[in-house]
């Protein structure tokens, strides 16, 4: 469901990027120093970091599958309130994993496409399914009836994605670009409330995208500290600033206010915090630079 959108609040990512950055992949998200390729003959060994990231995503998708199977049972049992409460929590695993999960476009369409994006691409609502199809029924029709077949299909589609992920080669470029793409997700859809248009549970997705980007940063942290300790300190501060803001909107240790309950001042503060985080995050590409001789 992540169609090309006007990249709100991320122009700064272009300004801090290096002129030697490669052209953006896929749907035209921010081109930054994070996407610079490493010369084959002078490549920094990041094999442990890439292996650890793949393991992290595989664990997230395992959790997604298990939780979605339980969600499907709630829907079949007609437990509307429980299903509504579980829905945004389940989705967080997918949102954290998007740098890899979204690279399989066919699976992303089946699992996570919004109605607006599906209709724009296919000119019809017929065939639309996945999390957001179920979301629409739960919140617009206020029932679990009609969700059962979509739930079964969703479980099968996640199983298919799980199998695909085992085949992917994770590169430093995928991780670096993925961290920026996760912030673009926040800037283009979470900030505007477009992601969870029926349930208004966008803050869960917002947090998960930030967590996904932060995981990439944490995996690179040891080597990044050797390159630029000041950059690491800045990233720590900016991640904390975003997370502290999100904490203000939590109603308990897991759940968040509806996005529609936030004021314009609230969303402005979140947008500014994401923009400030994007500046140093886009500089993580220095980790791929060989040490000076």
Q: Each predicted region: which residue ranges?
A:
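Mature extracytoplasmic or organellar-lumen-exposed domains after removal of signal/transit peptides
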Residues: 33-293
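Bacterial lipoprotein signal-peptidase II cleavage site
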Residues: 6, 16-34
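Residue-level signal for mature regions of secreted extracellular proteins and peptides
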Residues: 11-12
């Amino acid at each position: 469901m992540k169609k090309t959108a006007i990249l709100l609040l991320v122009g700064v990512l272009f300004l801090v990027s290096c002129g030697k950055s490669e052209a953006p992949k896929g749907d035209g998200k921010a081109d930054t120093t994070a996407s610079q390729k490493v010369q084959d003959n002078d490549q920094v060994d990041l094999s442990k970091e890439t292996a650890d990231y793949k393991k992290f995503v595989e664990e997230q998708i395992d959790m997604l599958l298990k939780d979605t199977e339980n969600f499907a049972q709630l829907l079949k049992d007609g437990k509307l309130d429980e299903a509504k409460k579980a829905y945004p929590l389940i989705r967080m695993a997918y949102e954290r994993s998007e740098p890899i999960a979204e690279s399989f476009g066919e699976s992303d369409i089946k699992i996570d496409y919004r109605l607006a994006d599906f209709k724009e691409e296919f000119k019809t609502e017929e065939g639309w399914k996945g999390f957001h199809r179920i979301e629409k029924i739960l919140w617009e029709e206020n029932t679990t009836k009609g969700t059962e077949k979509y739930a079964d299909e969703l479980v099968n589609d996640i199983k298919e994605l799980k199998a695909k992920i085992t085949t992917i080669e994770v590169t430093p470029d995928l991780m670096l670009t993925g961290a920026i793409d996760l912030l673009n997700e926040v800037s283009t859809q979470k900030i505007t409330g477009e992601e969870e248009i029926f349930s208004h549970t966008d803050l869960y997705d917002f947090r998960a995208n930030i967590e996904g980007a932060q995981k990439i940063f944490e995996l690179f942290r040891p080597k990044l500290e050797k390159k630029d300790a000041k950059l690491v300190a800045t990233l720590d501060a900016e991640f904390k600033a975003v997370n502290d803001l999100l904490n203000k909107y939590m109603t308990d240790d897991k759940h968040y206010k509806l996005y529609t309950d936030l004021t314009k001042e609230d969303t402005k503060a979140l947008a500014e915090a994401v923009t400030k985080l994007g500046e140093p995050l886009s500089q993580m590409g220095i980790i791929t630079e060989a040490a000076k001789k």
